[in-house]
Structures are given as structure tokens and as C-alpha cells.
């Protein structure tokens, strides 16, 4: 069990260590901890026994262990503080006109990367929760066409495909009509279910030759299930991550899944410190925070960095970016939902 004084000592060691990256001795703590040097040393020894501190090889000082950082995150981190001294710069960064959602998310990711020196990922609303609001097929050539999906009246997804050999022009119109009648207004998850339950019977009814039609449905809708993800500061991983982690970030869909799995449905923020047993994010910390995307749902901002981060400072920064980002997205979607010619 960690006493209140021992927790204060651990918090102070982490605060000093994340700023200096040097082992911390008892003398450095005496000004802030109202106890003798001997008492502080005894408490540090007890924290070491509990696995929260570890000895440095080059000095008599102590450093926080991975378990120490995990304890700090769980018991001492304030998730509601704001980096008030950085509010102006963050607001200023968003003071520009954006033409699509991805540009706004990229600005947020770039800003957090500049502030933290870490890698940052921003995720749109989870694909399965997005709603199909428009659909069309554009014929590109004699044998190719483009399926164009609009999700949540704001995000466009395209899927190019080869027109099946046995398809007539009227078959493309049937395909378009079925999708518009059966899928518009439904979530991507609902559509995934309908393709497996309703569509096989409908195809039998409307198409003379049904070969490959289900496969075509699967192909053109596959893109809708991909995460809309932006990333910034990937090169920063080279400063603190192993090669396996760096290569893992070449697979954005897997990165998105990893981030989502680290944040429960009922959590707005979380700090996850991965130990060496978790190969894809071994010895890395992930600070995840949900943000509101008005009229649509929630997205996620995630900072990925080394374990010895200044967690409180990063939480303060991500809180400010979240608030300013939500304000910008509110303006963006209010404009999208308004009559263009009535907006001044």
C-alpha cells in the first residue's frame, strides 16, 4: 500500500524526471516534501520494493518504472486541467478556412505533434456508426465505373470497379436503384448486415444472371468500412520506439483499431502504458481523448510517445485542442447543414 507521503514523493520524482530525464535523489525532494532526508530515502526504498521506482545504473538516484508511471496515471493525473498559457496559440492555429473534415483533423494532429514532439493520430466517427446519405455510380469507361458514397452528408468515399462481363447498362441502373432504395439513411453496420441477409434474395429477383453480383456488392462497399484516419509526426517514433512499432504505424487501419480498443465506450479519456508484452506498442504510452463531432458522433485524438512523458502537460494540451477543435467542427457542420446562399 502506498501512503500519502509516498504518493507525493512518487509524483514529484515523476515531475522532475520527465523534465530532466535524470535520476532523482532525496536531496532534490526535500524542498517540496516536509520530511527529513532519511525519511524520504526510506519511502523511496519502499516505493522501489513495490516496483514503482527503480535504481539508476550511473547514480544513487531513482527513476520511475513503467509500473510507477501506470500508478501515477491511475491515481494522480488530473484529466480536467487546461493548458491556459497555450490557449491563444491553439485558437490562432485554427483561425483559417477549412474545406474538408480531414484538413481540420490534420491541423489538430499537427498542432499536438508540435506541442508534444510525439506521434499523433486523429480518428473520425467510427465507420460502422456513419450513415449513408447519398449514392451514385459514374461510368468511367467501357469496362470501369466508380461508386460514390456520401456518409453523414459530409464525407465522400469512392470505390472503382470493373463492370462484370455479363452486365448490361440497365443492370448498373438496377444496382444503383437497389442501393438507393434499400441502404440510404442506414448506418454502415446496418448495410453490412443487409448485404448478407436481404440482398441475395433481391438479386435473384432483379438480375437475370446473378454470378458475381454479391461479390460486386462486397467489393464496392468494402471502402466504407475503412477508418478515416490522419496522422502527424510519424517520424518522431524513431526517437523513442522500436522498429516493430514504427512499422506498425504503416498499417493505419490496425493503428485505428488499437487506439479504439484502448478506450472503452464509457470513457472520454484514457492513458494506456503498454509493457514489453504488447508487441505492437511495446514500452509506449498512448493518451487518448474523445472529441465531439457535431451532428455525427465522436472522434478520437491520440498521442503516442515514450513512457517517460510529462502526462499532466499533455493532458492539459489535448484538453485545449479538443475544445477548440469541437468549436471549429461546430462551425464547419453548421455551415454544411445551412442553405449556402443564406450564409453571409
UniProtKB/Swiss-Prot annotation:
Keywords: Repressor, Stress response, Transcription, Transcription regulation. GO terms for biological process: negative regulation of DNA-templated transcription. Negative regulator of class I heat shock genes (grpE-dnaK-dnaJ and groELS operons). Prevents heat-shock induction of these operons. PANTHER family: HEAT-INDUCIBLE TRANSCRIPTION REPRESSOR HRCA. This is Heat-inducible transcription repressor HrcA. Coiled coil: none annotated. InterPro entries: GAF-like_dom_sf, HrcA, HrcA_C, WH-like_DNA-bd_sf, WH_DNA-bd_sf, WHTH_HrcA_DNA-bd, WHTH_transcript_rep_HrcA_IDD. It comes from Streptococcus pneumoniae (strain P1031). NCBIfam families: hrcA. The lineage of its organism: Bacteria, Bacillati, Bacillota, Bacilli, Lactobacillales. HAMAP family: HrcA (MF_00081). Belongs to the HrcA family. One of its GO terms (molecular function) is DNA binding. Pfam families: HrcA (PF01628), HrcA_DNA-bdg (PF03444).
